[in-house]
Design a protein with these regions (language model features):
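Conserved N-terminal beta-strand and adjoining loop/helix that marks the start
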Residues: 1-23, 42-45, 73
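A generic structural motif
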Residues: 12-14, 26-28, 78
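Short active-site-proximal "capping" loops at secondary-structure junctions
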Residues: 30-31, 73-77
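Nudix hydrolase/Nudix homology domain
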Residues: 33-34, 106-167
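Unchanged
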Residues: 43-67, 76-130, 166-167
């Protein structure tokens, strides 16, 4: 079973300017579709979540995170038939500076947008449930008592598998 740790950056303001929304990145997938998500990615061995997030935000957006609020929520996704388990921590960036520049060394991020909440919710609908449900709840001010979400993928083929929300 492969275990991944991923960080997600919730960026509601850049350079002290409130966006009434978020910074989102358009990720090109293998099937050529685009999924919109907050910036973030896999945390490298030896990095803390926030160190990895700072690196990912800079690589994907050109922005520098100087300060973080507390952890906003966590997500666990289990995919036993695919042989992996994913743990995500989503942190809110409170001090972000710089100019948006797409320079993703992985070549996945194709576009970065600062969007208001209504547009963010539309764009987030392109992402998996374990991304758009927690981010959408956060944007809408919904706070879950445990601060965590849990999903399971049933099936071994992406085109026919289904996602269940456990908690």
């Amino acid at each position: 079973m492969r275990n991944w740790v991923v960080g997600g950056a919730l960026i509601p303001r850049v350079g002290g300017v409130e966006l009434d929304g978020l910074v989102l990145v358009g990720n090109r997938r293998r099937d050529r579709s685009v999924e919109w998500t907050p910036p973030g990615g896999v945390i490298d061995r030896g990095e803390s979540i926030r160190q990895g997030l700072e690196r990912e935000v800079l690589e994907e957006t050109g922005l520098t995170v100087a300060a973080w609020a507390d952890l906003r929520y966590s997500v666990v996704v289990e995919a036993p038939q695919l042989g992996w388990r994913l743990r995500v921590e989503a942190w809110e960036a409170t001090d972000v500076v710089g100019e948006i520049v797409v320079a993703d060394p992985d070549g996945i991020v194709e576009e970065v947008r600062q969007v208001a909440s209504p547009e963010a919710l539309v764009l987030l609908a392109t992402s998996p449930q374990w991304v758009h449900i927690p981010v959408g709840d956060w944007l809408n001010g919904v706070v879950h008592p445990t601060g965590s979400f849990h999903f399971r993928i049933i099936g071994a083929d992406r085109s026919t598998s289904r996602v269940e929300r456990i908690a």
